[in-house]
Amino acid sequence: MNVLSCSINTLKGLYDISGVEVGQHFYWQIGDFQVHGQVLITSWVVIAILLGSATLAVRNPQTIPTGGQNFFEYVLEFIRDMSKTQIGEEYGPWVPFIGTMFLFIFVSNWSGALLPWKIIQLPHGELAAPTNDINTTVALALLTSVAYFYAGLTKRGLSYFGKYIQPTPILLPINILEDFTKPLSLSFRLFGNILADELVVVVLVSLVPSVVPIPVMFLGLFTSGIQALIFATLAAAYIGESMEGHH
């Protein structure tokens, strides 16, 4: 009976943890609108980290880069190569967009594991990685959708919409549906992976607080980086596809 009681208490504790992480949110009331305060706070922190790091790295640029400048130049080369591979020779104007997406998602994902969000107490809910919230991932996916529609229209004009009846007009509904499922798949993939990673770490910390969570956290950091790379790569691929006019 004691074992059963302990098991029930443990499950209740895990349920409470999950409820706090997923179900409760902190809002700001601005007029008649409710603004999701948790996401804005953590997003501003991530943006500040990116801007601060970039400023420190390039405040005294050298002809032969060292330290932070060398690291940021390596990251820029990586993003340029990825953009060129997915978009083609006209990748140049899209490097800032793809780079911003990659760096924001990468730092957001890592912030969930490395920054002590939990020590900041809110009236409701808890702070976590921005990408832990579906609002952030959907917004990023919608930005990607706007980007590839813009790329297609500026490159091909109104003939861009001809792709919806290729190779046959019968496929018009499916081709339209495809453009709606692209942002959905991007947003839910990123949201699900980051949320699941943070919940697993929280549960393991509550059960075995000293040893087991450490390798899981390292695995989470690895998968978080992979998710940022996947999102940025697919965003670049969609932009390249819209400019080329084929699937």
UniProtKB/Swiss-Prot annotation:
Superkingdom of origin: Eukaryota
Transmembrane portions of the chain: 38-58, 95-115, 134-154, 199-219, 220-240
Keyword Ion transport: yes
Topology of this chain in the membrane: Multi-pass membrane protein
Single GO cellular component term: plasma membrane
Subunit structure: F-type ATPases have 2 components, CF(1) - the catalytic core - and CF(0) - the membrane proton channel. CF(1) has five subunits: alpha(3), beta(3), gamma(1), delta(1), epsilon(1). CF(0) has four main subunits: a, b, b' and c.
The protein's name in its UniProt record: ATP synthase subunit a, chloroplastic
Gene source species: Jasminum nudiflorum
Encoding gene per record: atpI
